[in-house]
């Protein structure tokens, strides 16, 4: 029987492939209830997409703050080779502190996770000063000198820097103007003759003025009156526009794209912001109430780097893996389960179905690379559920249940995107019903 020509063929083929994949490929032994005794530590070690907070390397630390760099995404696995050009840095500082002027050899996407900041970008014709609040983001081009101030008297500042490397893939290097115990000023590497000619001054004066070691580190205490003077010229991020070419923008500038009583997702895509378009990156902010479930879904193009900012989450990610048995190459389904706590990072590859449950009130941020023209396809819920778009005639041949039974099953869930994480339909044995679910979807149980 013919079905509507308006139904997109690519969507039909993709969903049919997902639903029927277990008929062609072996399941990895993570069916419902199995491997429940596997320890969290063991699961983390076997999960190449999970990066615990202890995977950050400390680049600098003193009594005023710290700068940490996450290990390379592809350091322990070839599965994340597509992320070799990207690095994640975390900057934390105490109140009334300054990160000294420097420039990076990589493009940076700066995102404020906690607190407030004064960011000053220096250019040949002057400087731009911005006040950044929680949720603000801005792109800093490679080679741009900048410095950061925590102007608050009480609250710490925490910033996530997402680096896009290009000079040496996967390597981020910062060049500081000042001389510290850790590293001298890069100006000191020039010869005396070059410096004297450049500044038209004797070397002793240049050394005393610019090169002598003065600071214990690159994060220093700053007097309040000096902070107030710099703050007078600071511009705040605009919550009315997302398309500024060079000014900060806020993740919650617009209404959430998904929202109900269980959670919200704010998202800015490359199509809506020129800074993100230059980097081919999307940004989102996920907020969920304790016990809520972000239903199974997948991204068509974007690989999302999910950062746990506040709270705890239980995440299940489904992927396909190559396997060789008796000289024959086959594929198998694999469920990667993890509990994320503050500071942990999970990589969600494109096309990998994922579901997430809030173990407490939850706040997470996501950075999606290769994000242009990305689509998020839901596998459950009332709205934007791609399975609901499959006509009954095709469902008859796709699922164990009839097309009518599939439609009835999908009608049970009245909510969309975020739902109650506790199943309502429980059998006599205390287990959630999962009749007529193909193996792909049983991996989420």
UniProtKB/Swiss-Prot annotation:
Mind listing the UniProt keywords for this protein, alphabetically?
Seed storage protein, Signal, Storage protein
A Pfam family of this chain: Cupin_1
Please report the stretch or stretches of sequence annotated as the Cupin type-1 domain.
49-207, 249-407
Signal sequence bounds = 1-26
GO: which molecular function terms? nutrient reservoir activity
Gene3D superfamilies in the record: Jelly Rolls
- Tell me the SUPFAM superfamilies matching this sequence: RmlC-like cupins (SSF51182)
So what family is this one in? Belongs to the 7S seed storage protein family.
Q: How is the subunit organization of this protein annotated in UniProt?
A: Homotrimer.
Q: Which PANTHER family match?
A: OS03G0336100 PROTEIN-RELATED, VICILIN C72
Known function: Seed storage protein.
Q: What's this protein's name?
A: Canavalin
């Amino acid at each position: 029987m013919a079905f509507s020509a308006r139904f997109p063929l690519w969507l039909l083929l993709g969903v049919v492939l997902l639903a029927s994949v277990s008929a062609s490929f072996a399941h990895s032994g993570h069916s419902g209830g199995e491997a429940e005794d596997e320890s969290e530590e063991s699961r983390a070690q076997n999960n190449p997409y999970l990066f615990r907070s202890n995977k950050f390397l400390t680049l600098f630390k003193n009594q005023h703050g710290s700068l940490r760099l996450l290990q390379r995404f592809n350091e322990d696995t070839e599965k994340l080779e597509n992320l070799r050009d990207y690095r994640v840095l975390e900057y934390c500082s105490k109140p009334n502190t300054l990160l000294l002027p420097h420039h990076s050899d990589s493009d940076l996407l700066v995102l404020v996770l906690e607190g407030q900041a004064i960011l000053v970008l220096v250019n040949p014709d002057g400087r731009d000063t911005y006040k950044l609040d929680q949720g603000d983001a801005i792109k800093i081009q490679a080679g741009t000198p900048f410095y950061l101030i925590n102007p608050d008297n009480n609250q710490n500042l925490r910033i996530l820097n997402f680096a896009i490397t290009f000079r040496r893939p996967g390597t981020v290097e910062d060049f500081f103007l000042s001389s510290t115990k850790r590293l001298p000023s890069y100006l000191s590497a020039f010869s005396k003759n070059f410096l004297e000619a450049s500044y038209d001054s004797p070397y002793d004066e240049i050394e005393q003025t610019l090169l002598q070691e003065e600071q214990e580190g690159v994060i220093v205490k700053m007097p309040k009156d000096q902070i107030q003077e710099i703050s007078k010229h600071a511009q705040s991020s605009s919550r009315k526009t997302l398309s500024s070419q060079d000014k900060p923008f806020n993740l919650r500038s617009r209404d959430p794209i998904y929202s109900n009583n269980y959670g919200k997702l704010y998202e800015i895509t490359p199509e809506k912001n020129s800074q993100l378009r230059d980097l081919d990156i999307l940004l989102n902010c996920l907020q969920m109430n304790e016990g809520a479930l972000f239903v199974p879904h997948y991204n068509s193009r974007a690989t999302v780097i999910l950062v746990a900012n506040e709270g705890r989450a239980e995440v299940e990610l489904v992927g396909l893996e190559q396997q060789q048995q008796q000289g024959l190459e086959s594929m198998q389904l694999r469920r990667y389960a993890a509990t994320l706590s503050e500071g942990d990072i999970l990589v969600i590859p494109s096309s990998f179905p994922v579901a997430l449950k809030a173990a407490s009130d939850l706040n997470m941020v996501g950075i999606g690379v290769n994000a242009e023209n990305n689509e998020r396809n839901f596998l459950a819920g009332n709205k934007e559920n791609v399975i609901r778009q499959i006509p009954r005639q095709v469902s008859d041949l796709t699922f164990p249940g009839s097309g009518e039974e599939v439609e009835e099953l999908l009608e049970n869930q009245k909510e969309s995107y975020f739902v109650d994480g506790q199943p309502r339909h429980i059998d006599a044995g205390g287990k959630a019903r999962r009749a007529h679910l193909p193996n792909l979807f049983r991996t989420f149980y």
